[in-house]
Every structure is written in structure tokens, then in C-alpha cells.
Swiss-Prot record:
InterPro entries: Ribosome_maturation_RimP (IPR003728), RimP_C (IPR028998), RimP_C_sf (IPR036847), RimP_N (IPR028989), RimP_N_sf (IPR035956). One of its GO terms (biological process) is ribosomal small subunit assembly. It is found in: Cytoplasm. Required for maturation of 30S ribosomal subunits. The lineage of its organism: Bacteria, Bacillati, Bacillota, Bacilli, Lactobacillales. Belongs to the RimP family. It comes from the Bacteria. Keywords: Cytoplasm, Ribosome biogenesis. The keyword Lyase does not apply. GO terms for cellular component: cytosol. SUPFAM superfamilies: YhbC-like, C-terminal domain, YhbC-like, N-terminal domain. This is Ribosome maturation factor RimP.
Length: 157
């Protein structure tokens, strides 16, 4: 985790706790020539634009008040909901995703694939099982949790 992400996580957490919001993820990424500091937040029933703006304003105030500046380069601050394809980070995220369609990225390929989508049917501390449609048939596939690089909710087409 970068120092910018750690700093922002520490700064935004009390703001979110005060409002009963949840921190989903903080990322600091360069896209083209620009840097983006993205803070994804949520709450029971979903987050709205006014709530995102409130958090953005409070976080900006805290960042601007720090000396020295914790993020010396210019960047764009974005505070938003995680959207329909919410990342699965915490154990509770995975538990809430049982029965839902998800996308996983693997460190090592399984059956020649590193990107797999399916319905999460089972979960324990070591593995998760997806119901995956391969051509015309449905197959259950089990994956070691330690082989999962990233996971998120997905939209099924």
C-alpha cells in the first residue's frame, strides 16, 4: 500500500465513521499524465452524490491542512460509490456476495484461464466455489483463496 493510500485511509476513516459510511477502497493511480486519488465509499442502502460531495469536502480540508503535503504531486480527488461492480475486499464483502455473479482474477491460471466469472455458491476460509457456464453447460469450479488476485461483483449478460 502506498504512503498516499495509507495517509488518506487514516484521514478519511473518522469522517466515514461519523456518518456511518463504509470505506470500500482507496487507490492512487496515474492515468496518462494525470494522478487520481479515488476514494470509494458506501453505506447500507447505497450512497448518494451529496454524501460523496460531503466526504470529498471534508477530506480535502484535512489534506490541505497537512504540512508537509502528504501527496506532493498534483492529483484529482474523486469520492464515489463502488458501483455495480464493487470490489470484494473484506470477508464480509465475500459473505454478502454468496449467490451473486462475480468476476475473479487469478495469480495462476486454472484450466488456461486467469479471468473467470460465475455465481459464488460456496465460501470458506481456504476456498471459494463458483458456478461457471462453459459453452452450454454449467460447472462448479473451486479456487484457492490465496490464488485470487482480485474479486468484484460483476454484471451478467
Amino acid at each position: 500500500m502506498s504512503s498516499a493510500v495509507e495517509t488518506v485511509t487514516k484521514l478519511v476513516t473518522p469522517i466515514l465513521e461519523e456518518q456511518n459510511f463504509e470505506l470500500v477502497e482507496v487507490e492512487f493511480v496515474k492515468e496518462g499524465k494525470n494522478w487520481f486519488l479515488r476514494v470509494f465509499i458506501d453505506k447500507e442502502g447505497g450512497i448518494d452524490i451529496e454524501e460523496c460531495a460531503f466526504v470529498s469536502e471534508k477530506l480535502s480540508e484535512k489534506l490541505d491542512a497537512m504540512d508537509p503535503d502528504p501527496i506532493p504531486q498534483a492529483y484529482f480527488l474523486e469520492v464515489s460509490s463502488p458501483g455495480a461492480e464493487r470490489p470484494l475486499k473484506k470477508e464480509s464483502d465475500y459473505e454478502q456476495a454468496v449467490g451473486k455473479y462475480i468476476h475473479i482474477s487469478l495469480y495462476q491460471a486454472v484450466d488456461g484461464e486467469k479471468q473467470i466469472e460465475g455465481t459464488l455458491v460456496h465460501l470458506d476460509s481456504e476456498q471459494l466455489t463458483l458456478s461457471v457456464k462453459i459453452k452450454t453447460r454449467v460447472k462448479e469450479m473451486t479456487f484457492e483463496r490465496k490464488n485470487i488476485a482480485k474479486a468484484r461483483l460483476a454484471i451478467q449478460f
